[in-house]
Amino acid sequence: MINLQVNNKFGFGLMVAAVLFSILGTIGLTTKDSVDSIPTPNVPNSVFFADEPMQSNPLALLINSNAQIDWDRNDVFLVIGDADKKAQCDGLTFIEMVNQNSEVCTSRDNEFAAIGDDNQSGLSWQAKSGEYFVGIGTFSEAPEDFELNIDYEVKMTFSAVGYFVMVILFASGFTLNKYQ
């Protein structure tokens, strides 16, 4: 029977853990869900945000979270904005919202974190840490329907820093195993 010392066992455990986590980080974890019966706004080309922020990525340094959002109507666009952009859009008066000359808080506004104006290709966004809100708007005054159904998928994989941490973990285990 092989009698390994504590350092050897711990080093071997670190190396195995680093390899397993690297494999799991490469494969990734995917979650899917849907939200049904979201009421749509009737003000053309204006964004209305959700009250609650999206779940942030507190481990953004180690884990990449990529979201793909699809919806069932072509007369609706989706945006993702930070808390400052939400406050700006929520602070607009009705006259400012219906102003066709303004691009603020519309589908043409480039200050959003992500804009999805086509329900066929959807909206792709890499989740970041911080407060981000989903907003919806309609392209026309009279929407085709009063409800919106959204499907989303979030895939989480290791970032480059995550792999670097696993290499350091493996090297630490190797060092503990090699040098008693």
Q: What label would you give each PLM region?
A:
Residues 2-180:
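Acidic, Ser/Thr/Pro
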